[in-house]
Curated annotation (Swiss-Prot):
Residues 102-346, 779-1016 form the ABC transporter domain. The lineage of its organism: Eukaryota, Fungi, Dikarya, Ascomycota, Pezizomycotina. InterPro entries: AAA+_ATPase, ABC2_TM, ABC_transporter-like_ATP-bd, ABC_transporter-like_CS, ABCG_dom, ABCG_PDR_1, ABCG_PDR_2, P-loop_NTPase. The keyword Cell membrane applies. This is ABC transporter patM. ABC transporter; part of the gene cluster that mediates the biosynthesis of patulin, an acetate-derived tetraketide mycotoxin produced by several fungal species that shows antimicrobial properties against several bacteria. May be involved in the secretion of E-ascladiol to be converted to patulin by the secreted patulin synthase patE. The keyword Transport applies. Coiled coil: none annotated. Glycans are attached at residues 75, 772, 1318. It is a multi-pass membrane protein. It is found in: Vacuole membrane; Cell membrane. The chain crosses the membrane at residues 442-462, 472-492, 516-536, 551-571, 584-604, 692-712, 1135-1155, 1181-1201, 1223-1243, 1249-1269, 1372-1392. Patulin was originally used as an antibiotic and specifically trialed to be used against the common cold, but it is no longer used for that purpose since it has been shown to induce immunological, neurological and gastrointestinal effects. Genotoxic effects of patulin with dose-dependent increase in DNA strand breaks in brain, liver and kidneys have been detected in mice. However, more recently, it has been proposed that patulin might also have anti-tumor properties. GO terms for biological process: patulin biosynthetic process.
Amino acid sequence: MDMLRNRPVKGSLDHDPQLSADGTNTPAASDGSDQRSDVIEKTAQLSEPIADSIRRFFEIRKLDGPDGTGVVFENISVEGSGTGAQAAPTISSAARSAFGVLSPLQHRLAGQFSRPILSGFSGTIDAGEMLLVIGKPGSGCTTFLKTLSYMWDEYKDVHGDLTIGGHPIQESMVKRPQDIVFCAESDDHFPTLTVAETLRFAIRARCGPEASATEVDMMVAQLAKLVGLSQVMNTKVGDAYIRGVSGGERRRVSLAEALATCARLICLDNPTHGLDSSTALEFIETMREWTSQSRCVTAMSVYQASDAIMPYFDKVLVINSGRQVFYGRIGDAKAYFERLGFECLPTTTLSDFLNSMSADPEVRRVQDGKQHLVPRTSEEFEAVFHASTFYQDLQRSLETAKVEARTNPRPLVKARAFSLPLHHQIWYCAYRQFRIVTSDYSLWAVEPATIIVQSLVLGTLFRDQKRATQSLFIFASALFYSVLVPALQSMAEFGNGFAQRPLILKQKRYRICRPIAYALGLVTTDVVWKIAAICYNIPLYFLTGFQRTAGNFFTWFCIVYLEHLALSMFFRSVAIFSPNMHRAVLPVGIFFNMYVLYTGLYIPAPQMQVWLGWLRYLNPLYYAFESVMVNEFRDLSYQCSPSDLVPSGLGYTDMANQVCAVLGSRSGEESLSGMSYLEAQYGFGRSHLWRNVGINAAFFVFFALCSGIGMERLKTPAGRLATVFYKGRPSIRNSQADSESGAVHDDVPPDVSRQLSGDQHHLNANSERDKNHTLAWTGLCLDIETKDGTRRLLDNLNGWVKSGQLKALMGVSGAGKTTLLNTLAGRSSIGTLTGTLALNGQLLPKFFRSRMGYVQQQDIHLPTQSVREALQMTARLRRDESIPLEEKNAYVEKVIEWLDMEDIAEALVGVPGAGLNLEQRKRVSIGVEMASKPEILFLDEPTSGLDGQSAFSIVRLLRRLADSGQAIVCTIHQPAAELVEQFDELYLLSRGGKLVYDGPLGTHCDKAIEYFEQHSRACGQGENPAEYFLDAIGAGSRKEVQADWVGLWQQSQQSKDRERAEKALVPAEGQAPLAPARRSLYAVPFHVQLWVVVQRTWLYYWREPDYAMSKLWMSVGNALLNSLTYLQSPNTQRGAYNRVFSAFMSLIVGPPLGLQVQPRFVTLRDIFVHREREGFTYHWLAFVFAGIIVELPYTFLTSLVYWLLWYFPVGYFRTAPRAGYSFLMYELFAVFATSLAQMCASLMPNIEAAFAANGFFFMFCNTFAGTLSPKPVTPSGWRWYYKVSPLFYLGEGVTVDVLQDLPLRCAESEVSIFQPPNGTTCGQYAANFLQQATGFLLNTDSLSDCQYCRYRDGQSYYQQYGYDFANRYPNIGIFIGFIAFNFTMVLVMTYLTKIRR
């Protein structure tokens, strides 16, 4: 550790504490006078431009000479919810819980368990000091930082005292909450904004309205310079799906946001995650200077901290399983633990040594003869620390701080929690949202295009309707669609805000903007954007032939606009008050169907049942529909169409003896008043027009406020922070071990498996390897086309890796490490690749990818698979068919044993926080690839995000695999010296994908060091070789390259020797590629692939009961809504209308069904595309067919529930042929809805676009179902579409089935009355008419007031829709054909959008 002496700090790292009489450690005398000088010495080592940049930033920010305040915490204890290990939920367990069949009390009490996370933490952090928090994942580091940041609402209970500047944290958070900031490990940003826009928003929000635009821009420039982002300011931030800056640069954006707050207490959770060692060191240097100049307090956890980083910290806190085992000067920590009997090897970094005190006992090195004297458990460590003089000094410092706070109290001046007033926040949020909308192609181009298409189709379908009674229903349908399309758009948008929740909460913590400001900013943007959205519907208005006056048009526009706003706010509020998207789908689906049903068209107000009619008063869609109908009909009269005249035909010419058989008409009148029709048919009133506009405006305001309030009350869900789910019940051993650990991590559950210890398992190389393999590459170049021309990512690279070799692939940020790894593994799909790839001297064929293992940086797994199931699936699908299944499973058990995963073999992978921890997930990722028994194993950043001990555990595992004969290539970012020495060879890249070294590392990296020392400075004693290599070639944003390392390597003797050796490893020109061992690209036949993937998909559905229960309850809710609305419909004229629309309403559940189906399909697709596809695990058809096959049983079951609750209560035929036909058609419809949803999901790039597309296609299908737009009155240009409209065949079949042979009668209000000529009976006068009429006379012998009932039976009623009973059975086959077409398109669209390259 001599290298560390070059950086003196308070409490020098080589300081040796004295041993007190009681056997505890006593620190050497220190008067504390060197505190300021130590800080000066540290900052003096920084480059002057950085110090100047910070100083300049503070000057612009007007923070000269801030009043520094310290932090004091005493006896802090934290409890969180969680049960450690428990059985995974399934559909059966959810059913038992829902219906209370078995132990209902158990489920109610399941969430009441609490576990200690932190116990009795105490300490002080003075102003200008930096605290390093060390502990393995799961020990409580994140919890401690969140507790300092007063994020207490995430936990069940927090005890103890925490003060800032002598004031209780509660008081500080009330008066100055902006002084505390917590930067999480995740990077949450708006991906379509640029880096400059992201930082400008944060700085503008924290500086307040006083800062000018010039000052804000200057601060943005200075901050970008500090964190090394100056070159990417105009690049999108991006995310996993949107291309933007690199992962390391995105991390620096997050850190820059945290610094922009200029808080007095800055807590950073693993801030160097994703940064290479040089960039990480630069950031810590920046934080040292920032902390010293601002006199703030900085606390951070850092995993895999190098020795170069450690001196910049003043104090260190070591946590073991939620207990404080050391707190003091960082220079005293090493000696303290050495005095306890532990040993720190020369090659072990101080960070890793301290971190081992948090790990399991097996990974700690103990001095000879002290094995039984050292503490082992966290309780023992805590007891030893409490008995030491370090703890006594800590207690004295606490008392001193208390006395100082009492004697010299510092006034706590209350300041605004947010620098910007609320109205300014709303304005900036609205502007930001406008930028997001305009930068997202799908929002400003795709969505308007779909709306315009909808409007044009509907407008031409209802084009130029005449002012006649025959067009009354057509006008009503067109007006209904004008309010329905915005409703569909609003429903499709409900899920857009879930992804932004972590970002909104982060900006609330940073006091950048209030969540309510974000919500109202969205509202402000909507107010503008929805105007444009409604404008796209204008073709519908004018093409249909609505009243073309300015007053009527703008009234219509205002009505639809306010309805769109109100519904958008409503569905957004539902989403905000729902914990996640899956839970939100249920209320959204039920409310959407209720709104559509109670619009007033499907069931007019006079026909509504008394027990549900009140629902219309809660329905913005009802108010909008009534208003647009009144707006259109109020001043018009409609000529009675010949088909509506009773009687009509030859000999019936005197209107005095005729009547218009339409509700609202009067005997002897040739025209019908529009308002009379509305009042009689729908119960609408003229005076309701502007009243309804006002009500919808009130709905908009109310729901907007609800969304704002709901957003303001958003909290990070505490959840069950430490739950690992097992198949069945977890073993007692696992539960006990987990309970004893007592530690919980916010993001990662505690380690329930044992750590890798030494060489616990021996890997037999010869027994498990078929042969030795050598992968060689020569002249590799990769070029891509950009807007600025051709860009080379890889530049003439040569190299090889052999069986038994562990090769480290390193380089500066952006050097192309992952690109090279993808290229070697055959996974690169971009640009033009040239050069040669060979295995054992033969060219690589395409099939060889299935025999290579590739462990991605992201651990992508299906959450519901157990560890053993995940490995067994890979073994079954990627190992040759000729190998017996028993042998494959036996090999999986060996892999599980090698990776020390026996204890978690039956655990579900889960998600972070409710599943395996980060290291366990990484082991599973490695195990999945090892189960395929690959010839070459590639790993991309396997230690990223891990603590030092976990990283070493993973690398040591790789070392053992290499010793067993496995060839391994591994990229690595921040390797400690101990990690680097585990590798055999180093492959080092510089910027531009150029090679600067390829060769052996040697013992303690001496061979590689010797090469670099020939052309650069000498490697310091104890210096990390990896950092030395990267520093030499100019890694980091502030380094300048001092030599042409690419040229030096090409001219070196080592390079020439490697080139000569490579010639024997590459094929001669014209040599044939390696002969495939099998004909197929896949190891097993397709039917085996399909069976295995279906099994996995079935378990995915079975073990996530939320989906099945949501699907079931949506069916129950919508069926009851439909059946209770049309309960026992009578055999009247309106009863026939109700029977038709009840059947039609059963088809409206399609879009909500899509909301449930599509996320499942997308999840399965993404797992295949991002992990399983590249390894030829199984054919893409297998996952598509599996998604279809497994979905169908759930579809059949829930549609059966819907049909039973709907069909019989409405009063349809109960004969087996009729009921059976209806049941069959509804089951087919449910399958059709599933197929359409999956087709849209396969077509669209993301789930939001899939939601919108599903609504779009369903609107088309429903439009041409023949009910709202009857075929006989459809313009001839559109009649052809009924032949290709699937729901027309369904609607025809169901309608004729429920109406055929149904005798109809007339209620009193439905009778049309006309007067016969004097002296003529009604029967005599209407005899000729009745021969061709669809209705009948009620009083044929009367001489006056002839009563005519328009329809005599069901078939006479459905003829108006162009339906025919003879088509009933042929429609079944046709509809099945449409279903087959949809599923075929699922295959085609999946291939075109995700498979074809």
